[in-house]
Curated annotation (Swiss-Prot):
InterPro entries cross-referenced by the UniProt entry: TPM_dom
Pfam family, one: TPM_phosphatase
Record's keyword annotation contains Protein transport: no
Protein's organism: Arabidopsis thaliana
Keywords on record: Chloroplast, Plastid, Thylakoid, Transit peptide
Name by which UniProt lists this protein: Thylakoid lumenal 15.0 kDa protein 2, chloroplastic
Disulfide bridge map: none
Places the protein is found: Plastid, Chloroplast thylakoid lumen
Chief location: plastid
Lineage: Eukaryota, Viridiplantae, Streptophyta, Embryophyta, Tracheophyta
Range of residues in the leader sequence: none
GO cellular component terms attached to this protein's record: chloroplast; chloroplast thylakoid lumen; thylakoid; thylakoid lumen
Length: 223
């Protein structure tokens, strides 16, 4: 089970690859309307979670592609290229060559320390769609409810995209992911500083957030 996150439209001109809109309020010039989730809507979200994981790992970016002229029916078929996976296990897969060897090692070490300290499993995939292992990473990483899959892909503007397991979703405010994407994933940031800088900054921010005590104000600031 998983939740998908994208930055809100105001923070990204293009549609982000992995899409789930958590906006609970729409503001007009005359009023602000609060939307409450009904029991039926909650059931729908639950069903969506169970189906969303396979769509994310397909690498098809189905909803995003539908805005680029590719229909959902075609996009949802997805990508499954296990030949793009490394031969040995690693928590960082960079098929787009955004990261240097040293950066990959630093990120992998940070991820290992995080998993040891918290039990949460962060996994990083850097890609340029459609060059992606797609569905194959699900089994390669043995993705479960304690896993955060961070996909760095600049195809649709904002480079930061997240698939968050249900256990993680219980502890981390949902707004954290959109705020993180807005700060380090926007096109202006990664074009100026580089894709590698966006990836490293996001990993450190996630690590810092996951180490904070769970409470009303955890992850309030993006480190």
């Amino acid at each position: 089970m998983a939740m998908l996150f994208r930055p809100p439209p105001s923070q990204c001109r293009s549609f982000s690859p992995f899409v789930f809109n958590y906006s609970s309020r729409e503001v007009s010039s005359s009023s602000r309307l609060s939307l409450k989730t009904s029991g039926d809507e909650e059931n729908w979200v639950s069903r969506f979670r169970s189906k969303s994981l396979s769509l994310v790992f397909s690498g098809a970016l189905a909803l995003g592609l539908s805005l680029s002229g590719v229909g959902f029916a075609d996009a949802k078929v997805g990508v499954n290229k296990p030949e793009l996976l490394p031969k040995e296990f690693t928590s960082v897969i960079d098929v787009a060559d955004f990261l240097s060897n040293g950066q990959e090692k630093r990120i992998a070490q940070e991820i290992a320390n995080l998993e040891k300290d918290t039990g949460f499993k962060l996994r990083v995939l850097a890609q340029n769609y459609p060059v992606t292992p797609g569905l194959a990473i699900k089994d390669f990483w043995q993705v479960d409810d304690s896993t955060i899959v961070f996909v760095a892909d600049p195809t649709f503007g904002n480079i930061l995209n997240f698939n968050v397991g249900a256990t993680v979703d219980l502890d981390i405010p949902r707004s954290f992911w959109s705020r993180l994407a807005g700060k380090y994933g926007n096109m202006f940031y990664w074009k100026e500083k580089g894709e590698d800088a966006s990836i490293e900054a996001a990993v450190m921010a996630i690590s810092s957030c996951l180490r904070e005590p769970v409470g009303r104000n955890n992850c309030a600031e993006i480190q």
